[in-house]
Curated annotation (Swiss-Prot):
Membrane protein topology class: Multi-pass membrane protein
NCBIfam families membership: PRK13682.1-1, PRK13682.1-4
Pfam families from the UniProt entry: DUF1328 (PF07043)
Protein name: UPF0391 membrane protein Rmet_0093
Coiled coil: none
Organism listed in the record: Cupriavidus metallidurans (strain ATCC 43123 / DSM 2839 / NBRC 102507 / CH34)
Membrane-spanning segments: 5-25, 30-50
Domain of life per record: Bacteria
HAMAP family attached to this UniProt entry: UPF0391
Keyword entries, A-Z: Cell membrane, Membrane, Transmembrane, Transmembrane helix
GO terms for cellular component: plasma membrane
4Fe-4S is among the record's keywords: no
Length: 54
């Protein structure tokens, strides 16, 4: 589970670079939304991995 949390976090960072960096000017809003979605998924997956280990 922690592997997936890391993957989702990396995807969120990539979406943030495109959305907040202005690289993809036409898709800024979509990249910002994807950043938030993948950041939430990464946090949830990380917490589930920690809970499952106990």
């Amino acid at each position: 589970m922690l592997y997936y949390a890391l993957v989702f976090f990396i995807v969120a960072l990539i979406a943030a670079i495109f959305g907040f960096g202005g690289i993809a000017a036409g898709a800024v809003e979509i990249a910002k939304i994807l950043f938030l979605i993948f950041l939430v998924v990464a946090i949830v997956t990380f917490v589930m991995g920690l809970v499952r280990r106990r």
